[in-house]
Amino acid sequence: MTRPVLALDVDGVLNPSGSLSNLDPGCELHRIEIPACDVPDSPLVSGSGTRDLSTTVALNPSLHGAWITRLRGEYDVVWATTWEHTANTHLAPLLGIEPLPVGISVTTHPAYRGEDDDGIVSAWKARALSQAYPDRALVWIDDDNHAYATDPTWNTAHRWAAECDPRSGLTPAVMNRVETWLMHASRSM
């Protein structure tokens, strides 16, 4: 039996963008220094490969790290983020998780560069995930997939876009809905 796929974004999902006073008590702030050679070649990152990148992330290893580790026993959990392999190098250790496969990449989906279907920035991810996992049950958690979260042609019995509020990120309520969906999807495959 083929395992369902859980595709995770980072910024706005595992790394909420809300004010410090609104972050979950389990969030830990980390300053990350990424050498230029490790900066993903992404149109979202200025100076990719030429300048070091310094950023602060708020991660919750006790909530998200434990959840990801547990779900990996039954599902294929992959990165769906412009962090790509850098997420494994810099974020996975902070979350207390083993490295995850990179499910989609801006470098292998060139349609992303300069295109955004009708202003939908996450359209490249939707296309890339559909191409990468055409016959798999798939849940995609992102803070910028609103157009897909409400699209009945994208959300089917075997594919669902679960959205997060970027200010709070991945909450226990969203995690519970995702887990319920994954359980139903794995039974119906």
Where are these regions (language model features)?
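Alpha-helical substrate-recognition element adjacent to the catalytic core
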Residues: 2-114
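Short, low-complexity, intrinsically disordered N-terminal peptides in bacterial proteins
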Residues: 1-2, 189
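C-terminal cap/substrate-recognition subdomain and adjoining C-terminal extension
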Residues: 86-189
